[in-house]
């Protein structure tokens, strides 16, 4: 049978149609698979359970030891960097420097959000908006007033004011959350406070305005730490998600503080490449300081974070004495050692309390499991009579 050109062309068209149809079906299946994958990923990352899961993952990856170590290293680094910026470069605008820190932090978080790397936030309700606004306002007051206090007061007076934050946190947490502190922890906190006071008593230089700023900073600082800790532990916020929500509010209030607390002339500053680079490095460290502080507060408590700050002061004082040969005096060095002993005692009490909680919870869980297995055994024994029961 001869194959005519017309028959050949018709067969060819049929084959092409079959191939195209098969390709369309394959493409449709592939597109459907991609849509299903996209939907599953969206549900996984944006479901109501996602913030809680991400917070649990944050605690697994960054536990108390990692978070406190991270915050300790970054805090010491930014102290030297900010000292370089404020003294050597001559950037005498502490609130504006804080504003730059938060601007850089917000840009970095926006970059993370554009790549879908920013953790999801818990569902917003009317009752959850008030703590967010409160935290944003308190953060602006805490960080802004802290830098102003460092400008007008010595480091010793700044640390003496920080001692008052510890009893403020204990009193506020008792009023708001009915948290109680054991007698031994009160003793260890007292030892830490006395040690820091003795260590910094030789460096108490302040002005009247600086003293007013330092005492005005105590309540916002204590409130800031309490809110950061409790919003992460009770409302399933991660550190970065909470920073993303509160930073715009903080920036708004920092702008309103600049005319009252900063001298004029920030825009006429010598913005050379060296000066700008130093300020940007300080801002980058500021982002890491805020992030590490949030991680530490979420993993531990507000009091533990304050104790870490006082321990950092004593380590810096001893480092200057032993490494750089600074003449701090034997009284200051002795006070630093006393404060470190109090910090060690507080850490031991916290660790023992957490281990006791873990053991009690595990024993309670095993007891529940044993009771459940006993009930299952009883059901199995009664099973032959179950069909006759009415």
Swiss-Prot record:
Pfam families: TPT. Residues 356-390 are annotated as: Disordered. Coiled coil: none annotated. GO terms for cellular component: membrane. Keywords: Membrane, Sugar transport, Transmembrane, Transmembrane helix, Transport. Its main location: membrane. Residues 366-382 have a biased composition (Basic and acidic residues). Residues 356-365 have a biased composition (Low complexity). It is a multi-pass membrane protein. The chain crosses the membrane at residues 61-81, 89-109, 128-148, 155-175, 182-201, 206-228, 249-269, 278-298, 306-326, 329-349. It is found in: Membrane. It comes from the Eukaryota. Belongs to the TPT transporter family. TPT (TC 2.A.7.9) subfamily. This is Nucleotide-sugar uncharacterized transporter 1. The lineage of its organism: Eukaryota, Viridiplantae, Streptophyta, Embryophyta, Tracheophyta.
